[in-house]
Amino acid sequence: NAFANPSPEFLAWSDKYSDVMTCDIEGRFPWTFYLPRDPGSFGEVMGENGYFASEFLACNFNEGKSGKDLRAAVVQFNEYLDQNGSEVPYFYGVYYPQFETDTDFLWGNWHASFETMEIGNKDWEENGKAMQAKFDEISTCISPDYYDSRELYNNPNT
């Protein structure tokens, strides 16, 4: 791990870019990311400038439910999307915390813009009621947090 045992190269890089972004190692929290399908399967979410709109829902499993139940529902969700997905770019994933928290998982939705998010959400409200009911049997989520998002760094050679 580069942070726990930094190499001279890492220290030089960190010093060179210290004014770009600072990571508070003490304040970072690890997550395991569950990526259920190819991110580009419903179009390109991220624009050329790295921008995308995101929403995250903090969720807890209902009594007797677990990640196994969620994964089974995600298989059904993928089938739903294949048959009924809207025409706007969309991508999603699940974050499981690797630290003590009151939240069992975060559900993330990513869209090309807030306009396409609105179109996709309207389509979901009209056509996704049965699938939403399956998710509701498994977990309870609070209202989403919305973010203007950007990719900070992507090196395809690493």
Residues covered by each model-derived region:
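Short S/T/G/P-rich N-terminal loop/turn motif that feeds into the first structured element of a domain
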Residues: N1-T158
